[in-house]
Amino acid sequence: RFNRYHGLRMDFIYDGEHVQPAKHPYYFAGLFYLQEPSAMTPANRLPIEPGDKVLDVCAAPGGKATELGAKLCGEGVLVANDISNSRAKGLLKNIEVFGIGNVLVLSEEPGKIEEYFTEYFDKI
């Protein structure tokens, strides 16, 4: 059973034992993303508007990034970074499955991002 989680805009809490959402075809199709409420909160609290330029510095495995990307509605850009190359690969997979096209996935030190994108982002 899924219950509406009233703290966030489009999120539900799964409290059942018989269904395994991570094995559902809709999950593999990118129609929903599984994560803890604590991971949902940052992206839901940041006032993202379509067209914004957004940086997610610690983006893997992709929960915040997929929510931020969805809030951009295909406009603007999201730079999703994780300093771990292996985690960034998993992040890229999740972004691709979710179908968000305006995302640049990086595996870079934050200082390097600051150097190349000085005063570029609207939201971090």
Mark where each language-model region is.
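S-adenosylmethionine
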Residues: R1-I124
